[in-house]
Amino acid sequence: MREKKLLTHSEFQVMRILWNLPAQSGFTGEILARYEDPKPAYTTLATFLKILTNKGFVKFKKKGSKLFYTPTISQAEYADTFLSPVKDTFFHGSLQEMMRFFLRKENLSEGEVNDLIQLIHEVQGK
C-alpha cells in the first residue's frame, strides 16, 4: 500500500489540473495552459511534476522529446487519504458526527439541503 503523503498547495494545484485534463492531454504545456493567472514559469511547473513523480502521485511516459504526465491516484483516493485522518482525529471515526459538524457550521440553501436529502435517499436505496 502507498505511504500516505500530503500535497502542498502548489502540488495540489497541479494534481487538480491533471485530474481534470482530457485523457489525451498531459504534456507540460497543456498543463500550464490550464492554470489561471498568474501562471507559474514552465520550469517551475516542471519542478512540481518531478516532485509529484518522486512522491508517487504522477507517472510519465516519454512521447518523442516530450514527457506525458498522468496521475497515479484519483482525486477521490486522495480525498480519502486526506479526510479519513480528520474524521478519525476530530470526530472519533464517526462520519455522522463529521457531517453534523459541517451541516451546522455551513449556511446551506434550501436547494443544497434538498440535494443532500436526495443523496441520502440514493445511498439508502443501494
Language model region names:
Residues T8-S10, K63-F82:
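Short, cationic-aromatic polyanion-contact patches
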Residues R16-A23, E36, L103:
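Short, locally clustered residues in the helix-turn-helix/winged-helix DNA-binding domain
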Residues Q24-R34:
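Short acidic, hydrophobic short linear motifs in intrinsically disordered regions
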Residues K59-F60:
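Short beta-strand "wing" residues that participate in macromolecule-binding interfaces
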